[in-house]
């Protein structure tokens, strides 16, 4: 008996599709596939650091170090400053998780702070005085989300993770047994909630923390596994885009009136310092690199203006071989001199000694701006 073979019409002749489950997911689940981040470069304020590190909107930056006055908080505020200068319709959140930041230090940032939600407008920083982790994390996630849908951009800074505590640990009290959650657990919790929206909504996150031993109230409880040299633990190295480690300031890092002598309050004043920054994690293959950023003292210098431009520029000119060393003499490349002349800027061919080069740049704003543009063009190639 002959078998009947059914002939399919063109409409019926369809292959099984693997797209159905994905299409259903995209229709029903929470995702960020339709939100394309701009990944705009945000300056660290330092030409030296920016010459290699390319921090962008959507990233989270960790600033760690052992000790105070290393420059962690100051650098964090510079990131907030430059984010608000770069991103349209932007403002910032500052989570004051520790009570140590004085009004004087806030004034030093050059930023406009407010505690009043009605005054939190474009270009300002709202201070949140709280250290309870869960509501802070939720608030940041919700604020970043709401800002995106309002056509705004948000930078946020937690200063510091060491000051945060979980709600359950707060309820235990200071005398109850057991360990409270350390920074590694808090960091992991934060990144699980915030990493994706922060990236796709072009926010910028800055987190400071110190080196610290694990908080341990019960002396008989077993030691936890070692999770890394800093209080940020392994989660920082794996989940942050950049981790900058600020080194202890030694006498050799000080910038003095006379660097050949010891500092003295009256006869050899401290003019500034070199903040040494080691990259523990990077998005640009610069992990392990060390950078020295010159910082100048003085109440008149605020925010990113605390970075000593003439020192940075001189070092970069030598590094990029736009200025050549020959004994004590420093000679500008002839091409640079000619390019400057076409723009109405006259540059000396030779200068005797690095200190005189610093002074020459400091005293000639037009020359410094011209050379800064040249360096920026090389950095951005």
Where are these regions (language model features)?
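Conserved catalytic network of the ASCE P-loop NTPase/AAA+ motor domain
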Residues: 53-56, 83-88, 112-115, 145-151, ...
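Conserved NTP-handling cores and scaffolds of large molecular machines
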Residues: 83, 87, 113, 144-148, ...
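A structural signal for short, well-ordered beta-strand segments and their strand-loop junctions
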Residues: 94, 156-158, 206-208, 245, ...
């Amino acid at each position: 008996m002959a078998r009947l073979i059914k002939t399919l019409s063109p409409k019926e002749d369809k292959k099984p599709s693997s797209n159905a489950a994905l299409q259903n997911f995209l229709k029903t689940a929470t995702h960020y596939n339709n939100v394309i981040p701009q990944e705009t470069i945000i300056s660290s304020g330092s030409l030296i650091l920016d010459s290699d590190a390319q921090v962008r909107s959507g990233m989270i930056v960790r600033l760690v170090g052992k000790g105070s006055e290393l420059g962690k908080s100051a650098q964090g505020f510079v990131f907030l400053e430059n984010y608000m200068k770069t991103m349209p319709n932007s403002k910032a959140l500052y989570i004051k998780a520790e009570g140590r930041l004085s009004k004087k230090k806030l004034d030093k940032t050059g930023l406009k702070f407010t505690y009043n939600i009605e005054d939190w407008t474009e270009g300002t920083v709202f201070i949140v005085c709280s250290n309870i982790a869960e509501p802070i994390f939720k608030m940041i996630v919700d604020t970043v989300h709401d800002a995106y849908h309002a056509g705004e951009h948000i930078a946020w800074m937690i200063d510091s993770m060491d000051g945060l505590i979980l709600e359950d640990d707060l309820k235990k009290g200071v005398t109850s047994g057991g360990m409270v959650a350390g920074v590694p657990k808090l960091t992991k919790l934060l990144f699980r909630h915030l990493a994706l929206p922060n990236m796709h909504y072009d926010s910028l996150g800055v987190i400071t923390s110190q080196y610290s031993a694990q908080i341990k109230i019960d002396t008989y409880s077993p030691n936890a596994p070692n999770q890394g040299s800093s209080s940020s633990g392994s989660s920082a190295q794996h989940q942050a885009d950049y981790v900058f480690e600020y080194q202890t300031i030694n006498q050799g890092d000080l910038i003095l009136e006379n660097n050949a002598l010891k500092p003295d309050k009256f006869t050899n004043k401290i003019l500034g310092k070199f903040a040494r920054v080691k990259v523990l994690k990077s998005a640009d293959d610069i992990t392990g690199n060390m950078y020295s950023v010159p910082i100048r003292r003085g109440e008149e210098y605020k925010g990113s203006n605390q970075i000593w431009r003439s020192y940075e520029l001189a070092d970069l000119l030598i590094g990029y071989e736009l200025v050549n060393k020959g004994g004590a003499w420093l000679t500008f490349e002839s091409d640079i001199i000619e390019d400057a002349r076409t723009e109405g800027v006259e540059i000396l061919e030779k200068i005797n000694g690095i200190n005189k080069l610093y002074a020459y740049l400091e005293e000639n704003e037009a020359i410094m701006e011209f050379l800064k543009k040249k360096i920026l063009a090389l950095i951005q190639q």
